[in-house]
Amino acid sequence: MPARDWSANTLLMMEISGADSEKYRLVITSQPTVLIVRSTPNKTSPIVNLVRSNSLNEGRLYVAASGGNMMRQETNRLAIMTVLLGFFVIMLDTTIVNVSLAHIGKDLHGTTASLQWVVDAYTLSFAALLLSAGTACDRLGAQRIYLFGLILFALFSIACALSPSMGILISARALQGVGAAMVVPSSLALISEMYSDHKERAKIIGLWGAAGGIAAALGPIIGGLLVSTTGWRAAFWVNIPIIAVLVILTISFIPRWVPQASNSFDVLGQTTSIISLSLLTYLVITWGECGWNTAQLPALLVVLLCMGLFLILEWKNPTPMLPLTLFKTQAFSISSIVGFCLNFSFFGQLFVLSLYFQKYLGWSPWIAGLAMVPQATSAIVASPLGGRFSAKFDLYSAMFVGLSVGALGFSSLVVVNESTPYVLVALLTFCAGFGMAFAMPAATSAAINAVPYEFAGIAGGIINTARQTGSVFGVAILGIMIANGNFLAGFHHAVLIAGSVFALAAILVMLAKAP
């Protein structure tokens, strides 16, 4: 949390004695927020870790260093840099691995189906565990989950790098996805903890999105360089030194905030959630790869049964992993729908665009990867800009602007054919990516801001589950559009669907914003 001067907002201040014989000041401010501040400076440490946390309406109880500052400014910068870099390395790994698939198949004698599962196993475990990881942040503390997720991701990156067979690699990728599922929602929860001011938080979430955009842009380039010079295993080894530094920074500079949510563990809710999301993700992946057939009907019925059971259990549980009452808040529900739509269109279009370059134009994977860099780099500009726009105006306006620009960009790709100059394709894809990246910080901020502080972790889990589910559905549904034999017509249908989904989401946001 950034440094603050609480004196201007102080309503009541009294001195108390702590159990550690230290003198503290109890400070009640007009935020309303309660703080406990050391009466005497702690000269041995620039930061006093949080030891207790309670709610007072929307306020929080902190133990802070003398003067009321949660952190020194330089400590805060290191803490937020650690969070952003953690998200960066997760996104970097995803794009690097995609570039490495051909070399993995050649070295480990993998079939096309097994290579697809190198990606899909990670996607499945990541999507299935986001909700559980978000809940764990609220129950056990976001710093702890973030740290454990980084360590888990590093361990199974090593396992991937050492894999002697496709089976072991696919298993290691699935477990690597577990670590990623812990890092992503906990990074958002940590941002929420460090920045209680909504405008400042929106700016930081904009940087969070930019970190993902930079990773997506650099991934194909770094991956191509590593694979061509040292082999595909380097795509996994590259994670280790980065995460080693991140673990040290996390322990040193990110406070261990004491969670406010109940410590009770919703076993049935967790189990039905994981089964539902795992089966749903698996069904959509196989549907996109093989098409629909009646053999999948029993699995679909099991998914619907588990989802229904999950909702009933959560409704009746006094301390559920997923408080359904969160969806009564319009801003939270709208942001979750927008998150789904953003990833549905963007990643679905990204999939068909890569095939347009490779299958339709006949470009190599390396050249196709470079051709997609303009769209990936759009996030570097758009995410921070979207965060600042949200802070200056409002979240609904930022979502509407981003969705409108994205709808225009996606729909305009309908003019693309084999003779279209690449400069025009790059401009249109940049526009589509810009819209997505501009709207995403606002949607994420709206979800986090709409819930009580003690549910920041599960809020991050829900918005990221919505996004990840949107990605899986987008790739499957838009992928089907280009599988009918006439690639160009299918590509045009796919981008029109992507643009239409953005346009419908923009209309929904506009209606929600209207008084």
Model-flagged regions — what are they?
Residues 138-268, 453:
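Helix-loop-helix hairpins in multi-pass membrane proteins, especially solute transporters
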Residues 212-224, 277, 383, 471-476:
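Glycine/proline-centered helix-kink
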